[in-house]
């Protein structure tokens, strides 16, 4: 009788250990799914806020490119960064290369690049590439606008010392080269925005947000 009792005790202990292990593994899997869901949701909300900015200011991305210096570039920059995540960059475009605004600008660009990489890692399929490319193009557009604003600032400073025509100042600082780079960046951003702005694309992404 004691022999059978020991046997069943061993069996019950083994079953209890197995159940505990199963529950532990299940809890880990659920925890991992929750963490993945949280990461996906956070990145989705951030990129969606930037997409909304591009939607609200689509004319800046699609308007006819003028063959003259863009003296309102700083205002365009502010419009394209006018949300709670990006608004700290307003001072950066108003005071290019000045601290602490310049460091804040560099940090935010790095955050955007990191977000683009993270998007590819936590979302599946080609859909992730569309969004990561959009983030990279957005970051590159801000960089081009910032670089162009430095040129505009130098043109204004030069003109305050030695008044010249706008055409002369443009030639002196190779303004057209930077303007062309700006236009190219804006065109790429428009194309990548058009890709992610499609309803079917967003629906595919939202399906991956479901916690299962």
Placement of each model-derived feature along the sequence:
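Terminal, low-complexity, charged helical segments
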Residues: 1-6, 15, 49, 53-66, ...
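Transmembrane helix-loop junctions and nearby membrane-interface residues
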Residues: 21-28, 57-60, 64, 144-151
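Amphipathic, well-ordered alpha-helical segments in soluble domains
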Residues: 17, 24, 50, 108-111, ...
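Membrane-embedded hydrophobic alpha-helical segments
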Residues: 1-38
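An amphipathic alpha-helical interaction surface
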Residues: 77-212
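Amphipathic, membrane-active segments
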Residues: 32-74
């Amino acid at each position: 009788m004691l022999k059978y009792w020991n046997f069943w005790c061993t069996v019950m202990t083994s079953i209890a250990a197995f159940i505990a292990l199963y529950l532990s593994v299940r809890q880990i899997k659920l925890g991992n799914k929750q963490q993945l869901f949280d990461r996906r949701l956070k990145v989705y909300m951030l990129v969606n806020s930037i997409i909304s900015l591009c939607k609200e200011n689509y004319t800046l991305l699609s308007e006819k490119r003028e063959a003259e210096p863009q003296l309102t570039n700083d205002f365009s920059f502010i419009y394209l960064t006018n949300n709670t995540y990006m608004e700290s960059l307003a001072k950066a475009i108003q005071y290019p290369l000045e601290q602490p605004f310049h460091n804040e600008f560099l940090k935010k660009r790095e955050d955007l690049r990191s977000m683009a990489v993270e998007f590819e890692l936590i979302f599946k399929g080609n859909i992730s590439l569309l969004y990561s490319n959009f983030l990279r193009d957005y970051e590159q557009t801000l960089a081009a606008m910032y670089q162009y604003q430095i040129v505009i600032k130098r043109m204004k400073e030069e003109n305050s010392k030695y008044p010249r025509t706008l055409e002369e100042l443009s030639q002196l600082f190779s303004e057209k080269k930077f303007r062309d780079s700006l236009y190219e960046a804006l065109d790429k951003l428009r194309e990548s925005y058009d890709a992610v702005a499609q309803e079917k694309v967003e629906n595919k992404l939202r399906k991956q947000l479901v916690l299962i």
